Amino acid sequence: MVDTSSSALPPRDVLAGARALRAVAERYVYVSTVNAYRGWPSDPLTEASELLDGPPDADAEYGRLPEGWDGPDWYYGRQKAGAERAVLEVFGEKRSVLLRPGVILGPGEYVGRLPWWLHRAERGGRILAPGDPAKSIQPVDVRDVAVFALDQGAASVGGAYNVVAPVGRETMGSFLEACLEVTGRRGKLSWVPDAFLLEADVEQWTELPLWRTHVGVWNIDSQRARAAGLVCRPLAETVEATWRWLRDGGVPVTHSRAGEHGLDAGREQRLLAAFDGRTVSGIEG
C-alpha cells in the first residue's frame, strides 16, 4: 500500500484507511514530508530529529493557526506528523515505511517552482539569480521518489527515510545553468546576495522559488534512504525532462499553489537596478 495523500486527508482519515487495510496490506508506505520535523527549515536534520506534535486521530482543523499569527506555519507539518503516527499505530514499526521527501520536482509538477524558472529562462534577458551560486540544494525527482516508494513497499524493513538528493551534489548555480541550457541560453544570470534580497523584502521560497536562507532547508541527511536503494538522478536530467514535458504540451493539474510562485517582471528589473545602485529605496512591491 502506497499512500500519497496530502494534508487534505487528515490523520484520522489515514488512521481509518490503515485500519481497513491492515489485514490485506503487507506494508504501508506513507509519503510524508520534511515539514513534519520540528526543526525544519532552521536546523540540519536526520531521521532521528524530533517531529512536530500531531495525534493519530486529529481532524483537519488540528494545528490551524489563529488569524494574525506571524510565527512558523506548522499546520501542514503537524497534519503529516499525525498521519505518520496513525500509520505506526496500526501497522507497527516493521510494516510502516515513512518517506519524508523535501522539494519534489519533475514532469507533471503542479506547484510551479521548476516551471517558473524554466519559463523565466526562456524569456531571456538579465535574470535575477538569488544568493550564492555555490549553495547546495537537494530537490528530488518525482520519478525517483516513485521508484523508491514501490521498492520499499516490496522489501522494506520499515522505518523513516529522508528522501532528498545528497548534500553538496547540486547547487543553485548548476540548477539555474541547466534551466538556461535547455531553453536555449537566451538569458544571463545576475547573482544578488541574500542580504540585499532580504532587505528588499523579497519573499523567500515563493517570489524566487527554491531560494531560502535558513540553515537547515537544504541540510537533510539522506544516507539511510540511499543505503536502502534510493537513487537520485542528476538535477539537470530533471530540468531537461520537465522542459520537454512543458514543450510537448504538458499541463499540470489545477492547484491553488500554482499561482504563488515567481517574481513579477517589473519588480525583478527594479530589484536589479537597485542592486546596481546598491539601494533598496522604493523597490518594495
Task: Go through each PLM region and give its residues.
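NAD(P)H-binding glycine-rich loop region in Rossmannoid oxidoreductase-like domains
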Residues: 1-26, 30, 36-39
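Active-site "gating" loop of Rossmann-like NAD(P)-dependent oxidoreductase/epimerase domains
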Residues: 34-75, 89-92
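A short C-terminal helix-loop "cap" of Rossmann-like NAD(P)-dependent dehydrogenase/epimerase domains
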Residues: 118-130, 185-186, 217
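Conserved beta-loop-beta element that borders a ligand/cofactor-binding pocket
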Residues: 32, 83-108
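Substrate-positioning beta->alpha
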Residues: 111-117, 130-155, 159-162, 237
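Active-site helix of classical SDR
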Residues: 79
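Mid/C-terminal beta-alpha module of Rossmann-like enzyme folds, strongest
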Residues: 151-214, 221, 243-245, 250-285
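Conserved sequence/active-site signature of Rossmann-fold short-chain dehydrogenase/reductase
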Residues: 36, 104-106, 168
